[in-house]
């Protein structure tokens, strides 16, 4: 955990059969630390699969970096460096027939970002604040 309260991981990913499983496990681990509910974990894994399957096609050499940051209620991925307009191309490539665009449907925010030298895609998912452990989830019966 860093000083800002984030759990972070930096991965270098090359397109191939291990990209999705490795990235998925890292996302799963950090999502658990962030208190991610199971339904949103499934959404995060859909995003992971889309990034692992397609992002390398939009880089100069088939490799990308993925920076994952998680804290209670939020998971954020920064994907890149991508080639010029690669972030928009990556977003467009996530469209599936009959389903629509996976990234747009399940992420709370997707935003191409540019530094002076590179382009990145920021993908953010937010979810409700988890209940503290040991909290009462059912109403207590009235005392007689």
Describe each PLM feature range:
Residues 1-46, 133-144:
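Bergerat-fold GHKL ATPase/HATPase_c domain
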Residues 37-63:
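Conserved ATP-binding N-box helix of the HATPase_c
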